[in-house]
């Protein structure tokens, strides 16, 4: 396949055209008065959105050289979205501002490598300042504010705050379609897994077809139970206490199942048998989770624990165990809190190391089940188009809120980046030559987001910036929705620090790469030959 090449200044101008195409489409959505973009779909109804990353992802340019620039900006948006769940538009606006000014300097003869060095030094200084400005979330109201801003809806903000309050920092919150037009939160307390009773004869509530036991013992094993003899000693010990027994095993069959059912029907021993969740290594890990949560042990051949030797101390305990046809819920496990914390920390470390998205999800789910529970936000809407858009907003807001809990919050509306510029003044005095130009690029770009927010709301950015900087208060800024100057924290206009930091770092990274680009190589499009020769004219 033949290639086309473009060099130096011409190459950079092509990249700039691609950057502008994406950035100009995305930046009109910034702020509370950002506009919408309608995106055509190859099938189904068009999508209406004001989410930066969704718009950027849809853009492909016909000019292959310009398209390279467009793809680089898309990378900024999606990278920021992956890390923080929000801030994609801010990242795009920052990247465009840095690239535009940087290209002017390179065209005037500045050294791109030194400019990049200056950009990197300035960025790390501003990131430190963002960390200093940030403050931890102190209340559910703060969480609701962050979520409301990201989702552009107070109702969604309250739902996310409610869900996060219930499941805690490490809990899992999932987003699913509702069967009605209402949007609400469902909460599952305790450890829940998708395995139910092995036989319906265990049912204690025939109306609901479920088994409910208060303060049961829990026997956990990774074996198949078919021979009843090794189980008799522990069954007798439990029967003497008069408390119920829940057995979680790889499988329960033959005489063991018959014995358990008969004892249940006679009232000698209230019991239920449940298959262990998961498969292979995941099953072993989940059984260990259940054991730690309930304060028991896993009776496994691998560690040489025989069923005959089990004592009541080896069994897990819980406040309530509820077993349905295909799910089991353990509420109020009696495991030691410090052991549970250790296990959660261990799973957290695994999440950080894994690269597989699926593995990450399953580990987060396991951590949530140990840490407190699972909340499901059921999303309802009148039409399919509205449902898709609403679901997307909730998922974004959820990521942004998690980021806020993780690294704290900063004043929103582009104020933090604008005020963080002051740390660059000593840097600009220290640096010389082209490195100084790089730092100057970052300094100037930091006002781009607030300028764009003001512009989208119909105000003059220069006047807004002047008035905001007239006061030294870090939280003093401009509410573009109401057109008023105010304390951003009090007004609830806040951003997660992680979002602001990621937006700046990703924008600076792409700007540096683009400015140091000298050659573009693309594939030469093939000329399509007609399927058949043209008919001769007579």
UniProtKB/Swiss-Prot annotation:
Subunit structure: Forms a cylinder of 14 subunits composed of two heptameric rings stacked back-to-back. Interacts with the co-chaperonin GroES.
Family under the similarity heading: Belongs to the chaperonin (HSP60) family.
GO MF terms, alphabetically ordered: ATP binding; ATP-dependent protein folding chaperone; isomerase activity; unfolded protein binding
Gene Ontology terms: biological process: protein refolding
Cross-referenced InterPro entries: Chaperonin_Cpn60_CS, Cpn60/GroEL, Cpn60/GroEL/TCP-1, GroEL-like_apical_dom_sf, GROEL-like_equatorial_sf, TCP-1-like_intermed_sf
GO terms under cellular component: cytoplasm
Enzyme class label: isomerase
Subcellular compartments: Cytoplasm
EC number: 5.6.1.7
Pfam families registered for this protein in UniProt: Cpn60_TCP1
NCBIfam families: GroEL, PRK00013.1, PRK12849.1, PRK12850.1, PRK12851.1
Function according to Swiss-Prot or TrEMBL: Together with its co-chaperonin GroES, plays an essential role in assisting protein folding. The GroEL-GroES system forms a nano-cage that allows encapsulation of the non-native substrate proteins and provides a physical environment optimized to promote and accelerate protein folding.
Record keywords: ATP-binding, Chaperone, Cytoplasm, Isomerase, Nucleotide-binding
Record CDD domains: GroEL
Lineage top rank: taxon: Bacteria
Name of the protein this chain belongs to: Chaperonin GroEL
Entry binding sites for ATP: 29-32, 86-90, 413, 479-481, 495
Reaction equation(s) it catalyzes: ATP + H2O + a folded polypeptide = ADP + phosphate + an unfolded polypeptide
